[in-house]
């Protein structure tokens, strides 16, 4: 077995772009998702090492210090971070001439040839679900025999092997939490709406929804929700509860954990027996009966992608959600005492000044506890990217998804709505949602009830206002 380094490379200060972040950008407040995609394959390679640089405040010099310890380096990359990640790979190769190094992630899965052509020092890239592709490299198998691999042969020519079949039995994958225990400091991972410290993991891959903007189902996970067995999930939570007694919350980061409702309820009941607090992603259509089962068995929070308050925009992006159903679902959650973190996207196809106003009013009406407002990001490999090129919504001048400091930009524009108008609407959205007497009172009440929460919210407040000031500087 090759001595293998799995690396989420150093990047922008505070850049949440790891192998677990759906939107790669510097957040409004300090936030880091776990590098779960890398941890999963690290668990398949005995003796490997996982380094998640940014949350652990590691710079390039820290990584290079041990470069000669490894035979193989596997870096996770993304469209926004690719140029920076290539420079890190080149530095690793300069420090260890015998090192084989390559990339995994959605960026290289959909653009394997172009990615390899960016630097002759990139030895390989892996497509879609790369777990067993990388394991076979680490085992020393001939690269020409490994499905799902694109690579540079001994002559320097680029070769593309047949794609790897998507994994069907998710219980074949080992637990990720032992890798967290071995290689990560979990206190370094923050998500503003989750308790701290938290742990996130997947209980399945894929999503049956067809949202045009969503990256993973269109590039690496597919549109069939493939799940781990209930017993397998519960066994990992049981392990993690003992391995990390300090953890206050578990988060299931499947694209839509609630799609299989009988399974959701079965897992909930088992978690209830364990007595753990947990949260998950959900679509805004979960029946009240299922919500009650979840709530009664330890569910605290749902992360819900509302995206827009305009029904036509939801049709345009194939969200498969009705505004009236979302309203009823949200009302049920409020009545059951389930906290909601709502996410919204501005700049989607069909957006106008009027629909932005409609979405802001919708968010204020349904009133989730906290929100995230993102900008529509046309990642290569998505339907949104194809549409943007076809209709001229994306131009070279504004094609970057982030600015040089890692802040998310507004790459799309429309004949009736400019990049700048879309970008500036994010700040307006946040101000009009949070700067209301009831919302301010709720935050103060939360702080008064918990000294730990008071310290945390004060820190987040400082970071949030600094973020808004930074956005204003970008505009001016």
Positions of PLM-derived features:
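Radical SAM enzyme core and accessory elements
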Residues: 1-6, 27, 47, 65, ...
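N-terminal [4Fe-4S]-dependent radical SAM core
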Residues: 2, 143-146, 152-200
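Short glycine-rich His-centered loop
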Residues: 2-32
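Flexible glycine/acidic-rich beta-alpha junction loops that bind and position SAM and/or redox cofactors
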Residues: 11-20, 112, 154, 209, ...
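Glycine-rich beta-alpha loop elements in corrinoid/cobalamin-binding modules
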Residues: 37, 41-169, 375-381
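Short, solvent-exposed turn/loop segments enriched in Gly/Ser/Thr/Pro and often Arg
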Residues: 39, 54, 105, 253-260, ...
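Non-cysteine beta-strand/loop elements that form the S-adenosyl-L-methionine
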Residues: 130, 291-309, 369-378, 398
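Radical SAM [4Fe-4S] cluster-binding motif and immediate context
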Residues: 176-341, 348, 353, 358-361
């Amino acid at each position: 077995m090759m001595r293998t380094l799995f690396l989420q490379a150093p990047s922008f200060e505070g850049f949440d772009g790891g192998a677990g972040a759906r939107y790669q950008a510097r957040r409004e407040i300090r936030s880091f998702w776990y590098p779960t995609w890398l941890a999963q394959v690290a668990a398949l390679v005995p003796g490997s090492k996982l380094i998640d640089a940014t949350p652990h405040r590691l710079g390039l010099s820290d990584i290079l210090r041990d470069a000669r310890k490894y035979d193989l380096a596997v870096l996770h990359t993304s469209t926004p971070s690719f140029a920076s990640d290539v420079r890190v790979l080149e530095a690793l190769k300069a420090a260890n001439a015998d090192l084989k190094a390559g990339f995994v992630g959605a960026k290289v899965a959909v653009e394997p040839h172009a990615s390899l052509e960016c630097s002759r020092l990139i030895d390989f890239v892996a497509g879609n679900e790369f777990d067993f592709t990388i394991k076979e490299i680490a085992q020393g198998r001939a690269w020409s025999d490994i499905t799902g691999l694109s690579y540079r042969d001994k002559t320097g020519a680029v070769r593309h092997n047949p794609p790897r079949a998507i994994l069907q039995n998710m219980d074949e994958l080992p637990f990720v939490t032992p890798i967290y225990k071995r290689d990560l400091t979990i206190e370094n991972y923050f998500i503003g709406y989750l308790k701290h410290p938290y742990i996130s993991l997947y209980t399945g891959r894929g999503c049956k929804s067809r949202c045009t903007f969503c990256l993973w189902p269109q590039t690496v996970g597919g549109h069939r929700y493939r799940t781990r067995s209930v017993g397998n999930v519960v066994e990992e939570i049981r392990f993690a509860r003992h391995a990390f007694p300090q953890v206050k919350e578990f988060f299931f980061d499947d694209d839509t954990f609630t799609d299989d409702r009988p399974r959701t309820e079965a897992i909930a009941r088992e978690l209830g027996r364990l007595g753990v607090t947990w949260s998950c992603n959900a679509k805004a259509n979960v029946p009240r009966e299922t919500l009650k089962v979840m709530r009664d068995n330890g569910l605290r929070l749902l992360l819900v992608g509302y995206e827009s308050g305009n029904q036509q925009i939801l049709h345009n992006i194939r969200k498969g959600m009705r505004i009236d159903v979302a309203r009823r679902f949200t009302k049920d959650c409020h009545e059951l005492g389930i906290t909601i973190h709502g996410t919204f996207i501005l700049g989607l196809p069909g957006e106008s000044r009027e629909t932005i106003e409609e979405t802001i009013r919708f968010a204020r009406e349904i009133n989730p506890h906290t929100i995230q407002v993102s900008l529509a990001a046309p990642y290569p490999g998505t339907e949104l990217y194809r549409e943007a090129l076809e209709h001229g919504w994306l131009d070279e001048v504004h094609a970057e998804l982030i600015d040089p400091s890692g802040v998310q930009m507004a790459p799309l524009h429309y004949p009736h709505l400019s990049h700048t108008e879309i970008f500036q609407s994010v700040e307006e959205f946040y101000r009009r949602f949070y700067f209301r007497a009831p919302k301010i009172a709720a935050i103060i009440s939360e702080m008064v009830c918990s000294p730990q929460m008071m310290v945390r919210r004060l820190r987040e407040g400082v970071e949030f206002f600094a973020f808004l000031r930074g956005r204003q500087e970008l505009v001016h």
